[in-house]
Every structure is written in C-alpha cells, then in structure tokens.
Design a protein with these regions (language model features):
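Sec-dependent bacterial lipoprotein signal peptides
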Residues: 1-20
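Short loop/turn and low-complexity linker motifs enriched in small/turn-promoting residues
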Residues: 19-143
Length: 143
C-alpha cells in the first residue's frame, strides 16, 4: 500500500511540476534602467503542451517559466543577445536579436507536441493577446 501511495505522489508531483511558473533563474543585469530595453513574452492558450511550462532563456540562461494564458516582461541591456524558449530538459530554440535602448520587443510562444517556438510579433498583435492573459510579475523592481 505504501508503494502505491508513493507512486501516486511521484506521478502527481511530476504532473503539477510542469505547471509551475515564475523565476527559475536571475533576470538580466541592467545597470541603467532609463536606457534599458523591455522584452514582453506572451504565452496564449493552445491545446498542445498546455500542461507544461515553457522555460524562457536569455543569453543561454534560464530566467523564468511561463504557463499558458500568461505574459511577463523584463528589462534587458541594449546590445546583441539571444532569447529562446524550451521544454524543461530539452535544447533551447534561440533567436539572435539586437536590442536598441528604450525599445519594447514582443515575443509570442507557440507550441506543438514536440517543442516550443518563439516568434516576434508587433505591438498591435501583442496588445490583442495581452487583454485576455494574466500578468506574471517577475520582480517588484522591474520598471
């Protein structure tokens, strides 16, 4: 009986751990917030992979996990960087980008049964998504 109970705990724990969201690493170091770029990550609802958190990766470091119907934003220093998204335990699909000072960049997460994808969208497209999503705060100090 004890083995069955422990097996159920492990199974349900594994299922719910995929639903976690929030910081899993550190945000990019920004020394001058008045000059920082802002990155907004949007994860709208989709049926595929809806029970799995997407790991957002900036400059090859995991920074946060995000669930469906959430969006988050974070500051980043201007310059050349990479951003990506991945399933926990799988390689990252990275995008190279050049961030300009004081600019906003919007990225949307797509998913299928094999992996996540990340693509840049316009502000107009982002605002249409955001109105139906929950904001996930990453840090009280984010401007």
């Amino acid at each position: 009986m004890r083995n069955i109970f422990m097996s159920l705990v492990v199974i349900f724990g594994s299922l719910f751990s995929g639903c976690a969201s929030g910081l899993i690493g550190t945000l990019p170091e920004v020394t001058n917030y008045s000059n920082a770029s802002e990155i907004i990550i949007i994860r709208p609802f989709n049926f595929e992979a809806h029970g799995i958190s997407a790991y957002v990766v900036f400059d090859n470091s995991d920074i946060f996990a995000i669930r469906i119907v959430q969006y988050a934003k974070f500051p980043a220093p201007p310059g050349n960087h990479t951003i990506g998204v991945r399933y926990p335990g799988l390689p990252t699909n990275n995008i190279a980008m050049l961030l300009a000072p004081k600019e906003r960049y919007y990225y949307c997460i797509g998913a299928n049964l094999a992996n996540f994808s990340l693509f840049q969208i316009t502000e107009k497209e982002a605002l249409l998504f955001i109105k139906d999503l929950y904001y996930m705060s990453l840090d009280n100090n984010v401007k």
